[in-house]
Amino acid sequence: MEPYILQDEELNELVVKIPGWEIKSKQIQREFNFANFNEAFAFMTKVALICEKYNHHPNWENVYAKVIIKLNTHDLGGITNLDQTLASEINKIFDQ
C-alpha cells in the first residue's frame, strides 16, 4: 500500500467511520481501557503483529490498564491512508 496524505474531507470521514479516534496535532489517537495490565498487554501484542504486517508502527503509551495509540506517517508528515487502515484494524482487535 502506497501511503498518501489524507485531505480534510477524508479526515472528517475517518473520525466518523472509525469510532473512538480523534485528530490531534497531525496524528490520530485513541485511548483504550482494560480491566488490568494483562489485558492491556495482550492487546498491545496483537496490535504489534498487525503493525508488522503493514510495516507501520504507532507511537503508544501504556500505563497499567490504559493504552494510548497515536498514528501518523512520519515520512509524509501527516495522517495517511495507512494510518486510517491501521486504526480500523486496531479497532477490530479491540472489539474482539
Swiss-Prot record:
Pfam families tied to this protein: Pterin_4a
Molecular function in Gene Ontology: 4-alpha-hydroxytetrahydrobiopterin dehydratase activity
Bilayer-crossing regions: none
InterPro entries: PCD_sf (IPR036428), Pterin_deHydtase (IPR001533)
Domain of life: Bacteria
Keywords: Lyase
Family statement drawn from the similarity comment of this UniProt entry: Belongs to the pterin-4-alpha-carbinolamine dehydratase family.
Gene3D superfamilies linked to this entry: Transcriptional coactivator/pterin dehydratase
Catalytic activity: (4aS,6R)-4a-hydroxy-L-erythro-5,6,7,8-tetrahydrobiopterin = (6R)-L-erythro-6,7-dihydrobiopterin + H2O
Name of the protein in question: Putative pterin-4-alpha-carbinolamine dehydratase
Native source organism of the sequence: Prochlorococcus marinus (strain MIT 9215)
Known EC number: 4.2.1.96
GO biological-process terms attached to the record: tetrahydrobiopterin biosynthetic process
Lineage: Bacteria, Bacillati, Cyanobacteriota, Cyanophyceae, Synechococcales
